[in-house]
Amino acid sequence: MWDPDVYLAFADHRGRPFYDLVSRIGAKRARRVVDLGCGPGNLTRYLARRWPEAIIEAWDSSPQMVAAARERGIDATTGDLRTWKPKPDTDVVISSAALHWVPEHADLMVQWATELPHGSWIAVQVPGNFETPSHAVVRALARREPYAKLMRDIPFRVGAVVGSPASYAGLLMDAGCKVDAWETTYLHQLTGKNPVLEWITGTALVPVRERLDDVSWEQFRQELIPLLDDAYPPRSDGTTMFPFRRLFIVAEVGGARRSADVS
């Protein structure tokens, strides 16, 4: 179960990639803007300010997140992103930190490029940190008893969870898009007690929490603390450096053909 309050504990840090993504969208005006994986809606509200004339459509698979988004005045829908279909007036599709949960997300992006009108925009951001300690120590601890028997069928994300900027760009260019793709590593300077643990509690640990009772969950968290401290040691000033790699893909549908015509 996703907890909007836990997720929002690092709202400033989590929000920066969203704004970096949206800043590269070239649409001056838009009829309909769609936020796929809207979460609690705190960032979706910015889209209404960026495109004040647009209808804002928001989706998330978590009923808890959708409820939180609706409390913020967002017309959000609970649904599987794999079933979403663009309406004819859709000019901008944004998905920030959501599509990595969908194994076939690259195919979805290409499908959207074939279904959206020419001149529309697709903007996607996904994390690319699945081999870092914040994920690796969780997988390692989950393989130990007494946890292993409870979590052996959790599809922990490992290996090629996401592609490279070049791989996404190539797929969308082949679909006729003009593409801007890049990656960056944010160096988050976290404060507070066990900040990396609290960060992943709102994301990577969600499927773990669903399998454990309250006592086992607290025990699991306590056993994670020294493992995370070894990987992300707190500084003497109280901050903890938390590197976080993210990938960005911004595509203009039909833009490649238009560029060729101009040249």
Curated annotation (Swiss-Prot):
Pfam family, one: Methyltransf_25
Molecular functions per Gene Ontology: trans-aconitate 2-methyltransferase activity
InterPro entries: Methyltransf_25, SAM-dependent_MTases_sf, Trans-aconitate_MeTrfase, Trans_acon_MeTrfase_C
Predominant location: cytoplasm
Presence of keyword Protease: no
Family named by the database record: Belongs to the methyltransferase superfamily. Tam family.
Protein name: Trans-aconitate 2-methyltransferase
